[in-house]
């Protein structure tokens, strides 16, 4: 079976709550680090989530 291009990433909250989302991204079309504004349920606000490594 062929190995896919998409790689799992972890989106960490910039609010410092420890909350994170996991998603996948295509490394070939998006080589830079991902930043998305998403909802953080701990602080109950939309904050910026930055890409980090899955441990």
Swiss-Prot record:
Q: Which Gene3D superfamilies match?
A: Ribosomal protein L33 (2.20.28.120)
UniProt entry keywords in alphabetical sequence: Ribonucleoprotein, Ribosomal protein
Q: Which GO terms describe its biological process?
A: translation
Q: What GO molecular functions are on record for this protein?
A: structural constituent of ribosome
The record's Pfam families line, in alphabetical order, gives: Ribosomal_L33 (PF00471)
Output a single Gene Ontology CC term carried by this record. cytosolic large ribosomal subunit
Q: Which InterPro entries match?
A: Ribosomal_bL33 (IPR001705), Ribosomal_bL33_CS (IPR018264), Ribosomal_bL33_sf (IPR038584), Ribosomal_zn-bd (IPR011332)
Q: Give the family per the record.
A: Belongs to the bacterial ribosomal protein bL33 family.
Identification of the protein by name: Large ribosomal subunit protein bL33
Q: Which organism is it from?
A: Aeromonas hydrophila subsp. hydrophila (strain ATCC 7966 / DSM 30187 / BCRC 13018 / CCUG 14551 / JCM 1027 / KCTC 2358 / NCIMB 9240 / NCTC 8049)
């Amino acid at each position: 079976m062929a190995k896919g291009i998409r790689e799992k990433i972890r989106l960490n909250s910039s609010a410092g709550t420890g909350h994170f989302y996991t998603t996948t991204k295509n490394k070939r079309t998006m080589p830079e680090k991902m930043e998305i504004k998403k909802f953080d349920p701990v602080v109950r606000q939309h904050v910026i989530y930055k890409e980090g490594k899955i441990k």
